[in-house]
Amino acid sequence: MALLLLLLPLLALQAESTTFTFTNKCKTTVWPGALSNSGTAPLGTTGFELPTGATRAVQAPAGWSGRFFARTGCTFDSSGHGTCATADCGSGQVECNGAGAAPPATLAEFTLAGPSSSQDFYDVSLVDGYNIAMLVEASGGCAATGCAVDLNRRCPAELRVGDGDGQACRSACEAFGTPEYCCKGAYANPGTCRPSVYSQMFKSACPRSYSYAFDDPTSTFTCTGPADYSITFCPDSTPSQKATRDSTTTSAPKAKGVVLEGGGGEGGSEGESWLASLAVGSGAPSRTRVSILHQASLTLFSTTVAIFLLFLGFC
């Protein structure tokens, strides 16, 4: 009886834990990393190798919050020391040991239900740029989210870095560092920091991922009740529409699954310019194309007015 009483807290903790299952569908090995938020205990692992086709489960306790990412183009020696071409956490080891990913990096962010909340909150963020396609799916019918498009193959030249396994797509903030792109200073609130042409391009390709700092209404999802999560790198198909259970974006109507355009995570045309493809486009016009055309129309109108006024001055 005494032994049972000692085991009860352990059994309760196990029942409240969440399982994250990582699957690698990329053509090459990836090295997932984990970073716990401040005040949150670290997980049992902070980084590991995940070969092509492999799956690994990681447990997280109730109330855990943090982020996951995948490093690519890594070279580690037999003692586990080395570096990665993208999303390197700077630890010099397979384990990240409390360090986060260097941008550009695709991030899956979670805050699990705990004493202060009965809901899980989760999102996939491109705010720090993009290095790999990622899909997050929740058990129990809660909504999927992520970015299944290979943005590296369609990244604008001014945002593109690296090549091969080290290729990635920077955010406009990292590339240009200005307050309006980084939502800092006078732009540090939703009213003044608006989506740029670049963040609109990210949003057009991956409509349920964070595209800039204040993209909350369509990018943060919740799940009520116990749920486990699968995180797939380079997902090979777009998930179908499906019903959800108690799963919503934080400021939007209930979602019915997720449409991740572009199919497989390693598809796309080599060397295709994302900006050019959006400008000329195919199918229904996107908000990004409309925005670009609107800006061009305003510029043309302003130029015409200036020439007309100049002509009147000569007369």
How does the language model describe each region?
Residues 2-315:
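Extracellular low-complexity, O-glycosylation-prone Ser/Thr/Pro/Gly-rich "stalks"
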